[in-house]
């Protein structure tokens, strides 16, 4: 059987970097997704080879694969706003102990800072 090459896939996806990212994503989908009937036929090949073959043959929707990749990279964490004033004040109190440290480009501002070593003892940086 003929080997699949990047040149075959470049007809579909001209940018090699984009090809690598999309083929990797599709190979992962093949690996995790249950496509037993289709993979049994191509049983001897690994998911990256199957992905490249399908991309070269035009069996994969590149636009759908790109959208799937973008959706997988998005974060879905939602931050809930603080409604209660007491809650917001409690959160502010937790961060009051943090000292304000300003560091210049040459780090000379750290010369007079005092740090705590691993034994819990203070030491100055200019020693």
Swiss-Prot record:
Keywords: DNA-directed RNA polymerase, Nucleotidyltransferase, Transcription, Transferase. SUPFAM superfamilies: RPB6/omega subunit-like. Belongs to the RNA polymerase subunit omega family. The gene is rpoZ. This is DNA-directed RNA polymerase subunit omega. It comes from Rickettsia africae (strain ESF-5). The keyword RNA-binding does not apply. It comes from the Bacteria. One of its GO terms (cellular component) is DNA-directed RNA polymerase complex. Transmembrane segments: none annotated.
């Amino acid at each position: 059987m003929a080997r699949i090459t990047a040149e075959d896939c470049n007809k579909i996806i001209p940018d090699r970097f984009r090809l690598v990212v999309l083929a990797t994503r599709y190979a992962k989908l093949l690996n995790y997704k249950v496509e037993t009937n289709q993979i049994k036929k191509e049983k001897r090949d690994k998911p990256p080879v199957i992905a490249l073959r399908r991309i070269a043959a035009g069996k994969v929707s590149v636009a759908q694969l790109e959208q799937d990749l973008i959706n997988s990279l998005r974060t879905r964490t939602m931050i809930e706003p603080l409604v209660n004033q007491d809650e917001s004040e409690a959160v502010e109190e937790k961060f009051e102990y943090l000292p304000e440290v300003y560091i210049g480009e040459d780090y000379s501002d750290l010369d007079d800072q005092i740090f705590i070593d691993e034994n819990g003892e203070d030491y100055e940086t200019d020693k």
